């Protein structure tokens, strides 16, 4: 199983100002393929940051 570093962008709309708040996270996950690694990272982000509305993996790199 390979290890991947997956960068995930989390976003939510602030109701007070109707503006978009964005935070970027990075996870290192073990997975057999890049697609599964991306899915795992998004799932971890959803569990840890429930206050965000959208999650998008924007970069994935295979680690040695």
Residue spans for each PLM region:
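Generic marker of "main functional regions" within proteins
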Residues: 16-18, 37-41, 55
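Short aromatic-glycine-(Arg/Gly/Cys) micro-motifs in beta-strand/loop hairpins
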Residues: 1-24
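Generic "edge-of-domain/loop-turn" microfeature
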Residues: 13-15, 34-36, 62
